[in-house]
Amino acid sequence: MRIRVPATTANLGPGFDSCGLALTLYLTLDIGAEADSWYIEHNIGGGIPHDETNVIIETALNLAPNLTPHHLVMTCDIPPARGLGSSSAAVVAGIELANTLAELNLSKEEKVRIAAEIEGHPDNVAPAVLGNWVVGAKLDGEDFYVRHLFPDCALIAFIPKAELLTSESRGVLPDTLPFKEAVQASSIANVMIAAILRNDMTLAGEMMERDLWHEKYRSQLVPHLTQIRDVAKSQGAYAACLSGAGPTVLVFAPRNLANKLQTSLQTLEIDADVLLLDVEGSGAEVFR
């Protein structure tokens, strides 16, 4: 059996800790034969565990402690610590592993709830489970979210080789915002969401670049954001914004501009991968 979970981008600018979008990069987990102990082969390196302390296995065992150990093989296109939901993908893969092997028959809603409990909020895990675009909130321990189709557009991901830990990126954020600024930040997010629902990416893109919640604070850790935004806007893109906590920057553009933008971004003197992606519509899947 094979489990496949998509990457995700969170925030989309002003939709801070609320908006998430599934992307066509994947964590794939092949479930092999039963074994005496858990072992997970993977291509990530970097100190990622191969035993039951791996997040995937740990998550599965928390849900189903009596699972029979298996040999697992993970391949992952989602680079860690780049703002593309790698940790959320691992958590969701663990939930799917337990659900499959222990025949838990979890609903998608239950999977989102469990994953959001582990991750703290649903912005990455909800689209990882459900696919497409999700707007969500966690209030008094309860998850509220709406899944909707995202407008058709090109997505160009500028993924620096250097990592940026979410903990570091969150450390530069203020504890509070002045009331007037928070009201303005909320109104910007509201207009962005309404524009997306109306398939108006021009207006949505303008709001994406007017975020007041987090990007201006994180820009000191992601100095290439302004440079990428300038290139993108000069060539007709809708917007460029941080993917999650960064350092990846996601560019939204008309499809006919995708190749040109990719080429232009590849010429920047920054060590990075520049990938053409799409919205992933299915979310986590199990292939038997």
Curated annotation (Swiss-Prot):
GO terms for molecular function: ATP binding; homoserine kinase activity. HAMAP family: Homoser_kinase (MF_00384). One of its GO terms (cellular component) is cytoplasm. Disulfide bonds: none annotated. It comes from the Bacteria. Keywords: Amino-acid biosynthesis, ATP-binding, Cytoplasm, Kinase, Nucleotide-binding, Threonine biosynthesis, Transferase. Catalyzes the ATP-dependent phosphorylation of L-homoserine to L-homoserine phosphate. It is an enzyme of class 2 (transferase). Belongs to the GHMP kinase family. Homoserine kinase subfamily. The gene is thrB. Pfam families: GHMP_kinases_C (PF08544), GHMP_kinases_N (PF00288). It is found in: Cytoplasm. Pathway: Amino-acid biosynthesis; L-threonine biosynthesis; L-threonine from L-aspartate: step 4/5. This is Homoserine kinase. Its EC number is 2.7.1.39. One of its GO terms (biological process) is threonine biosynthetic process. The keyword Secreted does not apply. InterPro entries: GHMP_kinase_C_dom, GHMP_kinase_C_sf, GHMP_kinase_N_dom, GHMP_knse_ATP-bd_CS, Homoserine_kinase, Ribosomal_Su5_D2-typ_SF, Ribsml_uS5_D2-typ_fold_subgr. ATP binds at P79, P80, A81, R82, G83, L84, G85, S86, S87, S88, A89. It comes from Listeria monocytogenes serotype 4a (strain HCC23).
